[in-house]
Amino acid sequence: MKIVLLGAAGFTGRAAAVLLSRRDDVGELILVDYDIRDAKRLAKALSPKCRWAMADVGKPLELPRLLAGIDAVASAVGPCAEYEKAILLSCAAGGIPTATIGEGTIPAEDRREIDGVFRDAGVPAVVGCGMMPGWTELLAAHFLDAGDGAMNPPAAAPATRYLFFSPARFGGYAFLREVAKGITSAATVPAGAPSGNYFAMPDGSRIGVPEGKAGTRLGWIVGTAAKLGVVGKEFSAALLLWTRGGMPEPAGTPVAVAGVATGDRFARVEDPRGNLGAALLAETAVRLAARPRKTTGLLPLPELFGGQEAEELAVRNGARVVTG
């Protein structure tokens, strides 16, 4: 199969490129990025099956020229609020199954529009194939609520989603920018989550970081930088990127943890390598390319991966699912 990977030179894109290039069922992998030099270097370092191309995904006419003969598109482009809808509509117009990292929630109106164009094109798409959203949805669907009667009754309220990460080892500029722009206030630690400092996001989810300099820096963003508006938060994102190498953290801190919690019940996946979101994106794109089912439109991620399949994917990438 032939797969196009958008945002290939970014943090998640690079990890996804490594994983896809190692798969026997991927015969050709096209690494696409605005910085073609980085895409070219990565392609040459990985495998002869890799090609490279440049595209500005913010321009609707840039993508169609790359989609001829393609079986699926995997998009690791961020920030998703700026680019995701345009990417999805372009891929649907080309009749190409598409998986996106989706670092955020697509508005309901946009979701209906995107679902409609993919249905009209007769192909499927999945949005939110990273850590949050992505693994958080798999955890909520398959691990948090077993529905086994009085010992584990269904949750009375939606689960709280969270992403805990090490700023020194996880995420690129687009991700840190979304964190800096999104966090609104300090929040409590969700049940079963790693200890640290947590902050609320507008959609009700939470972002967590280790205690110490990382927690202090995000607290400053919520307090002082927020008063400076958009400019202050843009500066804060750049500052996070520049200084994250000097943010020590407790021994044993995982690179990233995605989790869900309701009351005292929880499910989380611990990612010691920082590539689990990329692994989910890559696996989703391959499954969409193979088209084991003929369902079209936007597909819920938990319908594509059962609980056992999700856990096996985690284990293959050095991660583990923990419930309680």
PLM features: what roles do these ranges have?
Residues 54-70, 79:
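Conserved Rossmann-fold cofactor-binding substructure of NAD(P)-dependent oxidoreductases
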Residues 6, 145-266:
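Active-site-lining helix/loop region of Rossmann-like oxidoreductase modules
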Residues 3-22:
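N-terminal Rossmann NAD(P)H-binding glycine-rich loop of SDR-like oxidoreductase domains
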Residues 102-124:
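Rossmann-fold NAD(P)-binding glycine/threonine-rich loop
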Residues 9, 34-35:
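Residues in the short beta-alpha loop(s) of Rossmann-like NAD(P)-binding domains
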Residues 79, 90-108:
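ADP-ribose/adenylate-binding Rossmann-like module
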Residues 248-324:
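C-terminal helical cap and adjacent loop that interface with cofactors, partners, or active-site loops
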Residues 35-37, 105:
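Helix N-cap at the beta1-alpha1 junction of Rossmann-like dinucleotide-binding domains, i.e.
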